[in-house]
Amino acid sequence: MAQPLVKKDDDHDDELEYSPFMGIEKGAVLQEARVFNDPQVDPRRCSQVITKLLYLLNQGESFTKVEATEVFFSVTKLFQSKDTGLRRMVYLIIKELSPSSDEVIIVTSSLMKDMNSKIDMYRANAIRVLCRIIDGTLLTQIERYLKQAIVDKNPVVSSAALVSGLHLLKTNPEIVKRWSNEVQEGIQSRSALVQFHALALLHQIRQNDRLAVSKLVGSLTRGSVRSPLAQCLLIRYTSQVIRDMANHGQSGERPFYEFLESCLRHKAEMVILEAARAITELDGVTSRELTPAITVLQLFLSSPRPVLRFAAVRTLNKVAMTHPMAVTNCNIDMESLISDQNRSIATLAITTLLKTGNESSVERLMKQITNFMSDIADEFKIVVVDAIRSLCVKFPLKYRSLMTFLSNILREEGGFEYKRAIVDSIVTIIRDIPDAKESGLLHLCEFIEDCEFTYLSTQILHFLGIEGPNTSDPSKYIRYIYNRVHLENATVRAAAVSTLAKFGFMVESLKPRITVLLKRCIYDSDDEVRDRATLYLSVLGGDGTVDTDKESKDFLFGSLEVPLVNMETSLKNYEPSEEAFDINSVPKEVKSQPLAEKKAQGKKPTGLGAPPAAPASGFDGYERLLSSIPEFAAFGKLFKSSLPVELTEAETEYAVNVVKHIFDSHVVFQYNCTNTIPEQLLERVNVIVDASEAEEFSEVTSKALNSLPYDSPGQAFVVFEKPAGVPAVGKFSNTLTFVVKEVDPSTGEAEDDGVEDEYQLEDLEVVAGDYMVKVGVSNFRNAWESMDEEDERVDEYGLGQRESLGEAVKAVMDLLGMQTCEGTETIPLNARSHTCLLSGVYIGNVKVLVRAQFGMDSSKDIAMKLTVRAEDVSVAEAIHEIVASG
């Protein structure tokens, strides 16, 4: 029997709730299933048993083949019953049991009979079940019935056939594709649900044919879709067509944009919201295109229905990330939502306001946030904290009030992710705003006095060791750090010892005090703490052994000469023996990431994130990789890493691509190599680079790849020196050289002797755009006016004849390698003039803004007026030189 499940409630402590599934066991239910074999079927009792079986299956309970077969055969006997409710339960259990092909035959005749029944409910459910359990052979036998069902007058039957088609398309696409004519008729149905399912199926059938999808969208946008659900689907497909056309180089006015805009005037709210969302998510959407969508969303902000308010404010929140100025007109409406009873709406409203508000509204917003922070879940609090971090970077003069708010909520209750978000925000503020350093560090010190998370304590201690010694009074942090040695677990104590040592080395006046504290630590109960204390005392000279400053600095602050991931792997593989572990045996090359990892979407960087296990393919990953190689350590800070450039054709014996790493006076070519031949091992893999067409470059060094086994990517490097700060360009010829050794497939061992060989790669170019990092600005006009007008340089250029204005704009964008702003990369159809706004950071970390005005005459000759402003006038002149020579 079901057991009572007591549920506590603040207002009704005496209420009881009963769960009908409490205490259900598979064995007992299988015994009950014998009721299916009774001569006189009890529909109510049988339905209860089937419900229990469905519950067990959905809870992940596994049935053996014998158990499933027995239940299946017993259930088939229930087709004798005429009870409608029981018949529906029979359909469900057959679908869930998924009988094998030899068992399906037994139930097929019953289902076929139901599929041709006069009862529409039987027909619809029989179609759904049959399509779930049959294979391709049986499908061809019932295909005629399914086609008839698609165009059936009863919408329930028609929808069942269409939804079944969606499932069958995954396993039998060739058969389903033959139903296009019937599905096309379904789109003309007067039933909203049938039209919705028909459109979904027809799109799935044609999804791999870009032209067919475009034609489908074009035919339906003329007004033949009446179902709001189908209209929402059509809006999504239209957005995809617009994106595809943009990706394939079509410039000018967006196709189908007028359709999206017309949907904003639809009578169904779901269609209006879908259209508004689609417009806001268009690539490179302009302010003009956004305006009608923003206007509609603003009206929904004052809707009495919470779901509409939530949908509108969530969409506006996303828009505010890329086009904050477009959302400012909604600020008054969103301020009224801060006190909304729905905390999700209030959270989205406040975070949107934080992104769009001005400096004068910060104080008022912070007071309003304080009032509701305790009422929302941690996941929403994290969103608020992230918005505050962005706001502080945007308005650095307001750091005091924002830092105070963060420190207050840091002392409140909360989970690990929430606390980490706050700590990361404070760290970001400290790094970006020098004036905030001391107050921020003190807030972090107070937090670790009562921090329950070991990870956060160790990360904060590490950060204190880096930033604390450089403050005006480093001694005030010593008490907080040393308290951790007495009051925390071994991991935190070890981190505190390391932090103390850094203070002792960096601040000469503190060295005697630090030495005394470290001597106390050598009696700690944990061997890691004792070992660290002993080691640091030796480094600091506490035992009479004084290393040089350089050696001490390298030890305390330097990085290992080998990648951490390789060190970790080598230590795991090390087997204790009389021979000590040799760090020189750790390989210095880092394997390239698999393609799937490279494509994965990364999370945004945080202030105190743990280092990843392997270098990422992004800028930070490249920077870590290069800094781990001793030969490159003296090149300074990495300025830019390019996207990989393929140097081989697809499906060749060896796959090679190159990444260009730009330093102030060096360029490092990172050749990512993959051996695709299982029977070969490549050794001494190197790239010979001919720089005869790159006169300003001179080769400095190269780093070969010792071994390249099958399907195990590796990296070779070649370094060139160039004039410091100069955007030198040139073409490089590349030849891959290596020693080939045959591999025995049975043993996997390579032969001792190899043959030297080489493989010609494609040429590589270093262009002017490699010296520019794309960095956008949220408000181009303000950024432009903030730069000194005296550093402006203007000139005019003739770009010759072009097919279109868009071609000329793209050529200039590619040449300069800058980020387009405010959607100016989109050019109206048949436009004769256009202004493109560009921003970026030039080598040497110099901010650059460009206003390029294009004009085209009747003969398609294009002229350009280029206005450049930069923090350094010489950079503005360099941009003009690039254009003049390009």
From Swiss-Prot:
Q: List the disulfide bonds.
A: none
Q: Which UniProt keywords apply?
A: Cytoplasm, Cytoplasmic vesicle, ER-Golgi transport, Golgi apparatus, Membrane, Protein transport, Repeat, Transport
Lineage of the source organism? Answer: Eukaryota, Viridiplantae, Streptophyta, Embryophyta, Tracheophyta
Task of the protein:
The coatomer is a cytosolic protein complex that binds to dilysine motifs and reversibly associates with Golgi non-clathrin-coated vesicles, which further mediate biosynthetic protein transport from the ER, via the Golgi up to the trans Golgi network. Coatomer complex is required for budding from Golgi membranes, and is essential for the retrograde Golgi-to-ER transport of dilysine-tagged proteins.
Quaternary structure, from the entry: Oligomeric complex that consists of at least the alpha, beta, beta', gamma, delta, epsilon and zeta subunits.
Keyword flag Membrane: yes
* Pfam entry (one): Adaptin_N
One of the record's GO molecular function terms? structural molecule activity
**Its GO CC terms?**
chloroplast; COPI vesicle coat; Golgi membrane; plasma membrane; plasmodesma
HEAT repeat placement: 66-103, 288-325, 327-359, 360-397, 472-509
The Gene Ontology biological process terms listed for this entry are:
intracellular protein transport; vesicle-mediated transport
Name the chain's protein.
Coatomer subunit gamma
